[in-house]
A protein has these predicted regions:
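Short, surface-exposed acidic/glycine-rich loop or hinge patches that mediate macromolecular interfaces
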Residues: 21, 47, 137-138
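Conserved strand-to-helix beginnings and helix N-cap segments that scaffold or border functional pockets
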Residues: 20-21, 54, 141-144
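A general structural motif
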Residues: 2-4, 39, 65, 127
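Conserved acidic, metal-coordinating active-site core of Asp-based
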Residues: 105-161
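Short loop/turn segments at strand-loop or loop-helix junctions that form parts
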Residues: 7-12, 71-73, 124
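Asp-based phosphoryl-transfer active-site loop
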Residues: 2-21
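Charged helix-capping and loop-helix junction motifs
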Residues: 24-27, 144-146
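Active-site phosphate-binding/coordination module
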Residues: 26-122
């Protein structure tokens, strides 16, 4: 059996432009040639949700990955040769265990009285990702500390990003 090479890369400002920085000339072409090797297993690791990953692949002509770790690490997909995306449910269960089997909604209730938090849009959430905005000028450190304390008091293992 030939050796395999797992190649994991971010998308934004790594493979594709995002913001004012220009894209590196020829980078996508070189990358595409590299991942054509059948020994390469390609994974995109991104904060993007599935739809945004699919849009980026289409818009920039990126190679179809074998895996996507998306939504800031809260989802893992295996992409089949047919193009079907298969959610890794064992990863969801692992996070669920870390959350003491509490749901996204349960955590929303748990954090509802903390500072100036405002829930982000529905498309920026998933069953294991809870995203908020906080008011400009608010004490981000104090808010983060309050969230961490509240989660820890419930035995919830989570990381604030």
């Amino acid at each position: 059996m030939p050796e395999r090479l797992l190649l994991c890369t971010d998308l934004d400002r790594t493979l594709i432009p995002n913001g004012p920085q220009p894209e590196s000339p020829g980078a996508r072409e070189i990358f595409a040639a590299l991942v054509k090797d059948t020994r390469v297993v390609l994974a995109y690791v991104t904060g993007r949700h599935r739809q945004l990953v699919e849009e980026a692949v289409e818009q920039y002509g990126l190679p179809q990955p074998d895996f996507v770790i998306g939504d800031v690490g809260t989802t893992i997909y295996r992409i089949e040769r047919s193009g079907n995306w298969r959610l890794d449910t064992s990863w969801d269960k692992q996070i669920g265990s870390d959350w003491n089997d509490m749901s996204n909604r349960d955590l929303q209730g748990l954090l509802s009285d903390i500072g100036t938090l405002r829930l982000q849009e529905t498309h920026k959430q998933n069953s294991r990702k809870l995203s908020y905005y906080h008011a400009l000028g608010s004490d981000r450190g104090a808010i983060s500390s309050a969230i961490e304390t509240r989660l820890q008091s419930q035995g919830i293992k989570a990381r604030l990003v």
